[in-house]
UniProtKB/Swiss-Prot annotation:
It comes from the Bacteria. Coiled coil: none annotated. Part of the 30S ribosomal subunit. Contacts proteins S5 and S12. One of its GO terms (biological process) is translation. GO terms for cellular component: ribonucleoprotein complex; ribosome. The gene is rpsH. PROSITE patterns: RIBOSOMAL_S8 (PS00053). Pfam families: Ribosomal_S8. This is Small ribosomal subunit protein uS8. One of the primary rRNA binding proteins, it binds directly to 16S rRNA central domain where it helps coordinate assembly of the platform of the 30S subunit. One of its GO terms (molecular function) is structural constituent of ribosome. The keyword ATP-binding does not apply. InterPro entries: Ribosomal_uS8, Ribosomal_uS8_CS, Ribosomal_uS8_sf. Belongs to the universal ribosomal protein uS8 family.
Length: 133
C-alpha cells in the first residue's frame, strides 16, 4: 500500500510536516472527505482557515495553519486511527475523549463526517478516522 492510497493519512502527514517547517499554509488535493475533516479542524481552532482553488484543472485545498503566541503550532498531534488495511469502527458509546477533552476525534458516520462530541450527542458511531490534539 502506497502512501497516496490513504488520502487521509496523507492529509495529516502534509499538515504535520508543514507545521514542523513553520509554513503558513499547505496545499492538498481536494476531496469532499478531506474538506469535511479540515472544516472540523477549523471549527475547533486547529487551523486558521482554508480555501478550495482550481489549478491546472485540479481542485486543491489550501489550508492555512495556526500557531500560538509563542510561534508553536496549536496542533500537538494528528493521529490516523482507521486505515485502509485495518478499519476501526466505534459505537457512539465508545467514541474516545481525546487528551482530556482538549482534542477531537473525527468520524465518518451515516450522517456525514462528524466530530466525536457531535456524533456522541446524535448517538451515532462510525469509522474513527483520526484524533487531533
Amino acid at each position: 500500500m502506497g502512501m497516496t492510497s490513504d488520502s487521509i493519512a496523507n492529509l495529516l502527514t502534509r499538515i504535520r510536516n508543514a507545521l514542523m517547517a513553520e509554513h503558513l499554509y499547505v496545499d492538498i488535493e481536494h476531496s469532499k472527505m478531506l474538506e469535511a475533516i479540515v472544516r472540523i479542524l477549523k471549527q475547533h481552532g486547529f487551523v486558521a482557515h482554508f480555501l478550495v482553488k482550481e489549478e491546472n484543472r485540479k481542485r486543491l485545498m489550501r489550508v492555512f495553519l495556526r500557531y500560538g503566541e509563542d510561534r508553536r503550532p496549536v496542533i500537538h498531534a494528528l493521529k490516523r486511527v482507521s486505515k485502509p488495511s485495518r478499519r476501526v469502527y466505534v459505537s457512539a458509546a465508545k467514541i474516545p475523549y481525546v487528551f482530556g477533552n482538549m482534542g477531537i476525534a473525527v468520524l465518518s458516520t451515516p450522517q456525514g463526517v462528524l466530530e466525536g462530541s457531535v456524533a456522541r450527542a446524535k448517538n451515532v458511531g462510525g469509522e474513527l478516522l483520526c484524533l487531533v490534539w
